[in-house]
Regions:
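Canonical positions in the second alpha-helix
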Residues: 28-29, 62-63, 96-97, 130-131, ...
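Structural marker of alpha-solenoid helical repeat scaffolds
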Residues: 32, 66, 100, 134-136, ...
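Residue-level recognition of tetratricopeptide repeat
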Residues: 36, 69-70, 103-104, 138-140, ...
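TPR alpha-solenoid repeat register
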Residues: 39, 73, 107, 141-143
Length: 270
């Protein structure tokens, strides 16, 4: 089956991903129509933003009951399932979202990251590559980062190098992808390792959210680890993992990927 890039759909998903509703705002939507799937999605998102993941899962489930063909509630429930450690349930929900809306690359992306973080690295690469067909050039930075680091993890260094040809890294990245963009430009040799991390510049460039610099650094240091691994510099790779642990952001993809490596290196004690 051939999937088609849809700019309008991608813009809608950017809105869904970036929204930060309050619980009060979401409750107001539900008062207008408590059978509206979108209103339940907003409510679930609002609950998750205040740390109420189980309640958020219930909210998305209510939305699914009222509108079982509204894909964002499966997506939202999958994200919250991930947050509480129910990864197979998350994969199942992302898969349903994909079946309902197969041209939406965000659903493929979240299934890919979940597969990857739980040991199904080879399978995740297929989903990341599917995302490439469904997204525009400016959105390719996180995808190439994941494909590159996945190949490095699998020891397939030639494939890691080749995947860098799939992206034009001169294209401007969205603000939310600052770290991914820096990482890909490092992999391609456009940035020197010593210039890779510049905290003062980062503070001005990343999304203006609490702990955003630390979040970006977790992914960037993991990318640096993979870069030095591919280039045959194990000591420098290990130092990247040590530096990552100093800014550890639990839940960040880069931090999660670093844990088994840090344990193997003795940086994190069993």
């Amino acid at each position: 089956m051939k999937f088609v890039y849809n700019e309008e759909k991608n813009e809608e998903m950017r809105h869904i991903l970036m929204m930060q509703p309050t619980v009060e705002e979401a409750e107001a939507l539900l008062k207008k129509d408590d059978t509206d799937g979108y209103a339940w999605y907003v409510y679930g998102t609002a609950l998750s933003l205040v740390g109420k993941n189980e309640e958020a899962i219930e909210a998305h489930s209510h939305g699914i009951a009222f509108d079982p063909f509204y894909a964002p509630n499966y997506f939202g429930r999958g994200r919250r399932d991930n947050a509480v450690g129910r990864h197979w349930q998350a994969i199942a929900d992302f898969t349903v979202a994909i079946h309902l809306d197969s041209d939406n690359w965000t659903y493929w992306y979240y299934r890919a990251t979940t597969l990857n973080l739980h040991g199904h690295v080879e399978e995740s690469i297929d989903d990341f590559k599917q995302c490439m067909h469904l997204s525009e050039a400016s959105e390719h930075y996180p995808l190439i980062h994941w494909i590159y680091t996945s190949y490095v993890e699998l020891g397939k260094f030639d494939e890691a190098r080749k995947c860098l040809d799939l992206i034009d890294a001169t294209v401007e990245a969205p603000q939310m992808d600052y770290g991914y963009c820096r990482a890909v430009r490092l992999y391609k040799g456009m940035i020197k390792p010593e210039d890779y991390i510049d905290i003062p510049t980062m503070k001005k460039a990343v999304l203006p959210r609490e702990k955003r610099v630390e979040l970006e650094l977790n992914g960037m240091y993991y990318g640096l680890y993979c870069y030095w691994t591919l280039h045959g510099e194990p000591e420098k790779a290990a130092q990247a993992i040590r530096d990552l642990q100093k800014v550890a952001y639990p839940g960040a993809f880069g931090y999660t990927k670093s844990i088994p490596i840090a344990k193997k290196l003795g940086i994190i004690k069993e």
